[in-house]
């Protein structure tokens, strides 16, 4: 069964946003890493991967502003058994691929404009709480 496993926010202040979610909601940091043109800090509540994305100011990638120019909910991820098959399905439904060719996860613009991504099983491993 496919399910939502990840939610990402685009933020301007990574440290202040991290502190807020840790201090107010008790989220735990899983990892922080540099990914192409942004820093991705992954938090969890024990069930879902919650990423805070801080894009490089000079970045002009399609992904950076796909969901909006300022801070916003950037995208959510759906875990699928077969990323290639799911990609064919979303294309058949008129979706536009936003991520660079060959990049997994596959970010796309769904009907209505929402940005989502397809991820393989177990991409986001939570630290049980």
Where on the chain are the PLM-derived regions?
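Vicinal oxygen chelate
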Residues: 30, 42, 87-129
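N-terminal beta-strand motif that seeds the catalytic metal site of vicinal oxygen chelate
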Residues: 1-16, 73-78, 122-129
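Short, charged/polar surface micro-motifs in flexible loops or helix N-caps
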Residues: 46-50, 56-59, 82-84
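Mid-chain, well-packed structural core segment of small domains
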Residues: 69-90
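A short, acidic/glycine-rich surface segment
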Residues: 37-38, 59-64, 125-127
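Core segments of cupin and vicinal oxygen chelate
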Residues: 8-50, 98, 104-107
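Short Gly/Pro-enriched turn/cap motifs at secondary-structure boundaries
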Residues: 66-68, 97
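Acidic di-acidic motifs
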Residues: 13, 82, 110
């Amino acid at each position: 069964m496919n399910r939502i496993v990840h939610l990402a926010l685009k933020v301007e202040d990574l440290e202040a946003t991290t502190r807020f979610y840790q201090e107010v909601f008790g989220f735990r940091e899983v990892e922080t890493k540099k990914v192409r043109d942004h820093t991705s800090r992954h938090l969890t509540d024990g069930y879902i991967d919650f990423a805070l994305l801080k894009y490089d100011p000079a970045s002009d990638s399609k992904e950076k502003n796909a969901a909006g120019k300022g801070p916003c909910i950037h995208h959510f991820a759906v875990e699928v058994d077969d990323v290639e098959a799911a990609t064919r399905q979303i294309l058949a439904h008129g979706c536009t691929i936003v991520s660079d060719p060959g990049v997994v996860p596959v970010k796309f613009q769904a009907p209505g404009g929402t940005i989502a991504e397809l991820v393989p099983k177990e991409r986001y491993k939570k630290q049980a709480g």
